[in-house]
Amino acid sequence: MTNVVVVGSQWGDEGKGKIVDWLSERADIVVRFQGGHNAGHTLVIDGVSYKLSLLPSGVVRPGKLAVIGNGVVIDPHALIAEIDKLGKQGVQITPDNLRIADNATLILSLHRELDGFREDAASNSGTKIGTTRRGIGPAYEDKVGRRAIRVMDLADLDTLPAKVDRLLTHHNALRRGLGEAEISHQAIMDELSSVAARVLPFMDTVWLLLDKERRKGARILFEGAQGTLLDIDHGTYPFVTSSNTVAGQAAAGSGMGPGALGYILGITKAYTTRVGEGPFPTELHDEVGQFLGERGHEFGTVTGRKRRCGWFDAALVRQSVAANGITGIALTKLDVLDGLDELKICVGYTLDGQEIDHLPASQAQQASVKPVYITLEGWKESTVGARSWADLPAQAIKYVRQVEELIGAPVALLSTSPERDDTILVTDPFED
């Protein structure tokens, strides 16, 4: 038995929600360790759809403990809204099934506003990153700048005013520079007071909780958000998110030592998608790209934005395997490729006439690389609902084997539809 870390190996939207839900039945605890409510997923359980952006997937399953770690930035208003929405769907969230790290950073209204101000200014200058305008980046900035308001601060009214002063000294200077009205100290105090009673009952010392549960033999599932190529360090900077999304962050963002993380499962789509700005070497602007988007229903859960689509990029996923120490992958949306006459896989790039086997860190070079493809025969048969290798066409199996060889990691799970049971289990990560 081992713990399992789930990470996206591409630009997010790889189908982590279904796989995490599938694994959560085997877990005792499900932990979010980075990001905020800027990435969402939909779970379908007994015909009911649950849309989650901040809460760990475990909250919708009875008997599971969901944990939000210190690496997450928490918008208390979004948290309360998500809890209330689930309550109306019959899922009651209490301290018995949800705990929040006392040292997690809060996203406030001023963070959301600053995010929007900056994106508007960047749009005018052609330097837009394409954020969700939800305040994620500004909240992480305050965390690193040591001026953030954290969950525990809601319980300490004696020291809170001084912390708000420090926060506003920074933010009001920015707002003046942007030509925006300053925010009063009382407005922030009122905002914090309005959410404290709803948030504090869930507060806990998460690192200690997880350590105790680990020693008792609990199975812990760490649920990543976004994807490796959106990592602040290892992604396509600056078109990235504001946190580390790689597996190592599961330790830093929860307080669990890295030696206890266990199996690293990389969720990997059978083709490639990306939302928003940034380089995308295998992007398709033709009818195949349109086919993938329509067949794969490639629209964002949180923003509704249309995703850009392209061929599978083995060079990029190979980098993700290395950066995360991926043990095995869950290959998703294989069924979307049904019916294509031929399939291409990117195995590397050319840059200035030279062949390279990885995506450079340089923004200019990332924009200049050209993909090098191999071509495989497609398949006409349907893979939808396949639950064993015997259900798959021979060419589909060849495609999967080629992916494994090129990325240097085995397929542990294979998903053939959005339905959670339409999954081929090769290796149970909890038993590996």
Swiss-Prot record:
GO terms for biological process: 'de novo' AMP biosynthetic process; IMP metabolic process. Disulfide bonds: none annotated. It is an enzyme of class 6 (ligase). GO terms for molecular function: adenylosuccinate synthase activity; GTP binding; magnesium ion binding. Binds 1 Mg(2+) ion per subunit. Its cofactor is Mg(2+). The active site is at D13 (proton acceptor), H41 (proton donor). IMP binds at D13, E14, G15, K16, N38, A39, G40, H41, T132, R146, Q226, T241, R305. It catalyses: IMP + L-aspartate + GTP = N(6)-(1,2-dicarboxyethyl)-AMP + GDP + phosphate + 2 H(+). GTP binds at residues 12-18, 40-42, 307, 333-335, 415-417. Mg(2+) binds at D13, G40. Belongs to the adenylosuccinate synthetase family. This is Adenylosuccinate synthetase. It comes from Sinorhizobium fredii (strain NBRC 101917 / NGR234).
